[in-house]
Amino acid sequence: MTSPASPPLIHAVFFTLKDRSARARDALVAACRKYLTDHPGTVHFSTGTRAEPYERPVNDREFDVALVVVFATQADHDQYQQAPRHKQFIAEQSGNWAQVRVFDSWG
């Protein structure tokens, strides 16, 4: 008997920037696309700026850029965390991060 396949891992990251200008937000989105796409095991990738028109009471407005990467397995996610491009992204971009919130969940 085979064991059931592990569920995908959803890695959602919300960045609040020190420089919250449109230029800085766009630069982070571009860096996400440059360094964080096409990693082994990625089944979905998306990044973008906060949808400013949404001001409902339930909307969290304390972030500037969102990143969502879905990995086929937890092992794929764990390899991504150690990948040179991921580490380079952090090294180049973290100086402008006021806060980073990460939400990992099963898909």
Segment roles from a protein language model:
Residues 1-68, 72-79, 105-107:
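Short S/T/G/P-rich N-terminal loop/turn motif that feeds into the first structured element of a domain
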